[in-house]
Structures are given as C-alpha cells and as structure tokens.
C-alpha cells in the first residue's frame, strides 16, 4: 500500500477542504443575495431534512471502510462497502421521492417540495462517493477525494446562476441549490472513478461476513450522525414557529432561519477545514498503531484540534463586523457571529473526541452523549427562541447542548490516552 505521513495527508485534505469551504462560503454569500433570505430559508429547511436521507450512507460506512482498508492489503472492504452503499442508497432514494410530499408537510412549508425532489439522487451518488473516499483514506491516497470534492463544489457554484431562471417563485428559487448539488455530485463521482481506474481492485465475490463487520463498525457513528442531522431538521422546522410565537411575522421568521443556518453557521463551520482533515487522516493512522505510538498520535491529534478551535473562535469574533457589514451586508449579523463564535471550539473538541474513539473502534461511546445533547437542544430551542432573545436564544441553546455532549465525549475519550486504558489496535487475525 502506498503510505503517506499523517501530516502530509492532513495537509492535502486541509488544502482541499479549504478550497471547498471557500467556494461553499462564497456560494452562500451569492445565494443569499441571489435567492433572497426567504428562499434561502426555504432551501435550508429542505436541506436539513434531505440530510436525513444522505446520512445513513455517508456517515459511518466510509469510516468503517477506511479503518478496515488500513488493516488489509486487498480491496475487499471497498467491494463490500460499495455493495452496501448501492443497495441502501437506491432504496433510500426511491423512498425519499415517495415520501417527499409528506416530509414537506411535516416541515410546515409546502414550498420545500421541489427542493426535496431535485436533491433525491444525491442519496445514491453521495453514498457511493463516500465509500470510495474511505477506501482512498485507508490506503493513504488523499488526492483523488480532494479533487473530486473540489469538482463537486465548483460545479455547484458554477451551475447555480445559470439554473436561476427569471420569474421563479420562492419554491423554484429554493430548489436551485439542490439541483446544482445533484449535478455536482454526479460530476465528482465520475471524476473519482476516472482517477481511480488503475488502482481499484478487480471483481471480488460478495463477502457477507465482511459486510456484517462493516455494518457493526458503521452503525454507532451512523446513529450518532443521524441524531445530529435529525436534530438540525427538527430545529429548522421548530425555530420559525417559535420565532412567530415570540411575535415575529412568519415571512421574517423564515428569513431568520436563512440568516442563522445559511449565513452564520457556515462561517462557524469554517475551522472544520482543519479539524475534519485531521480526523480523516487520523482515523486510519490510529487504527494502525498501538501502545506508546498510539497514545502519542492521539495526543498530537487532540492538541491540533484544540488549537484550531481556539484560533477559529478568536478569528470569527474579531472579524464579525467585517463579515456582517462587508461580506453579507447584513449589519444585524455582527452580534450573531460573536454570540455563536464559541461553537467553533466546541465543534473542534467534538471532532477530536470522535476521531479518537473512531480510530480505536469505540465510536459507540458517542451515541448517548449525542442523544442527550439533541434532546437538550430541542427543549432549550423551544423555550428560548420564543423568548425575547429570539435568535440569540437559539444560539444559546446550541452552545449549551453542544457543551454538554462534547464534555461527555471528552470524558470517554481522554482516559484512552493513559497507558493503562489505551487499547491495542485490532489485528487482522
């Protein structure tokens, strides 16, 4: 297997993630101006629900493929993962198309229906691409996923403007980003297959035992991500209703969701450029190590994530005025950016804990903290978003709930750094 250092892989992935996030950030700015806050809010409602269908095939399975590929020299993990992603992705895509009218009703806004329909193929496309990404990370090949991800984001950016036909309704404008995402995912998967055509394993017989092992490894992380995604969908549907209860007009409440989820939170997630790259390179690296080398690697990964979180917090707080006034041209966003800035540190620490637990095959320990944090988020959003705090109440709910789940995860992860607690990496026997 062609091996690269963890630092080199993380650097490649960080550069790719940086370019992707930069394009994504620019896309959100353009969409905010091009679609309008109300259409952006409708899109965010639909997208939060759409992620529920994508998460089962993009969350735990790629990590499991990466971990098993790092321990094996053949391509059996890719073959098994690809088969699982194909079957699950196709079934979920068809189910999503059939249930979209019901989901639009549950979201409380029928204008989300076109956006739900046009993004349905992403379920299958994203699942297949994610498995190939996991295979590449396990083999120490970060470049193919990096180029594919860049292609997907660039295609989304370039296609949004041509797809925006003059005279579209709010529902039609809200469907534009989803259509561009589907086309971008198709282009990215095609490029990925082209780049990997010479290094993919030959046709292998179906290995049900390996498929079962992949499922067992992926289920805890998939469950955790599903809970997180479901919480975002529920909060996206709950927040405008609670803002209306606080006295805000319905159209203004929908626009407020666009401000928070379409403008503020994408900036808060920007430091994830580095922490996600550290995690993607770190999981297979941890799976290959044991003893002192394992503990040393875990400590380095955790320290790097902590530094990224602190720097991100400081940067967003310091640049809040520039982001609000110059980038988004929404002066009211300055206070929201400052209030939400601590989330960057919490997300970085959560990523570090998840990386350590996933690398050691103990990702199930993230499930209960995530469940408790999600329940707390819904309760606090229900109460505080309807108070005079409004959007600031929703941000405070995010901070408190995330802090609880992250501290819980750290309590499970940090003891694994001690010599007596750190388990050895599983062998291939």
Where do the protein language model's features map onto the residues?
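Hydrophobic alpha-helical transmembrane segments
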Residues: 147-162, 169-199, 373-376, 391-415
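Alpha-helical transmembrane segments of multi-pass membrane transporters/permeases
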Residues: 10-20, 116-117, 121, 136-161, ...
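N-terminal membrane topogenesis motif
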Residues: 1-23, 79, 208-228, 412-413, ...
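Short membrane-interface helical motifs at transmembrane helix boundaries
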Residues: 91-114, 310-330, 334, 339
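Residue-level signature of transmembrane alpha-helical cores of multipass secondary-active transporters
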Residues: 13-17, 51, 85, 119, ...
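Signature of the first transmembrane helix
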Residues: 5-62, 93-97, 122, 219-242, ...
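Membrane-water interface segments that mark the loop-to-transmembrane alpha-helix transition
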Residues: 59-101, 114, 292-312
């Amino acid at each position: 297997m062609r091996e690269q250092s963890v630092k080199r892989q993380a650097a490649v992935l960080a550069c790719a993630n940086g370019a992707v996030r930069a394009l994504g950030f620019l896309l959100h700015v353009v969409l905010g101006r091009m679609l309008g806050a109300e259409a952006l809010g409708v899109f965010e409602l639909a997208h939060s629900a759409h992620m529920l269908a994508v998460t089962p095939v993009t969350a735990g399975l790629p990590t499991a493929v990466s971990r098993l590929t790092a321990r094996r020299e053949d391509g059996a993990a890719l073959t098994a993962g690809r088969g699982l992603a194909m079957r699950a992705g196709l079934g979920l895509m068809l189910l999503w198309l059939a249930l979209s009218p019901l989901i639009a009703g549950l979201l409380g806004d029928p204008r989300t229906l076109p956006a739900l329909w046009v993004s349905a193929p992403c379920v299958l496309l994203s699942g297949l691409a994610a498995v190939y990404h996991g295979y590449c990370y396990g083999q120490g090949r970060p470049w193919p996923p990096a180029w594919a991800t860049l292609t997907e984001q660039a295609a989304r950016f370039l296609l949004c403007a041509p797809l925006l036909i003059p005279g579209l309704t709010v529902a039609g404008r809200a469907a534009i980003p989803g259509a561009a995402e589907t086309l971008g995912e198709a282009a990215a998967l095609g490029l990925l297959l082209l780049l990997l055509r010479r290094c993919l394993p030959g046709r292998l017989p179906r290995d049900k035992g390996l498929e079962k092992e992949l499922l067992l490894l992926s289920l805890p992380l998939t469950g955790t991500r599903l809970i997180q995604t479901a919480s975002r969908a529920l909060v996206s549907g709950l927040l405008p209703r609670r803002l209306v209860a606080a006295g805000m007009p319905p159209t203004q409440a929908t626009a407020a969701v666009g401000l928070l989820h379409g403008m503020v939170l994408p900036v808060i997630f920007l430091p994830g450029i580095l922490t996600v790259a550290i995690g993607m390179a770190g999981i297979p690296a941890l799976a290959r190590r044991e003893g002192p080398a394992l503990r040393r690697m875990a400590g380095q990964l955790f320290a790097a994530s902590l530094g990224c979180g602190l720097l991100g917090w400081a940067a967003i707080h310091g640049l809040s005025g520039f982001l609000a006034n110059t980038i988004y041209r929404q002066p009211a966003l300055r206070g929201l950016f400052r209030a939400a800035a601590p989330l960057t540190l919490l997300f970085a620490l959560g990523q570090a804990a998840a990386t350590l637990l996933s690398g050691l095959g103990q990702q199930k320990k993230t499930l209960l903290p995530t469940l408790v944090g999600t329940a707390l988020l819904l309760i606090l959003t229900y109460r505080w978003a309807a108070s005079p705090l409004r959007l600031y109440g929703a941000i405070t709910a995010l901070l408190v709930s995330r802090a609880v789940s992250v501290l819980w995860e750290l309590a499970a992860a940090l003891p694994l750094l001690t010599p007596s607690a750190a388990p050895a990496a599983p062998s291939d026997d």
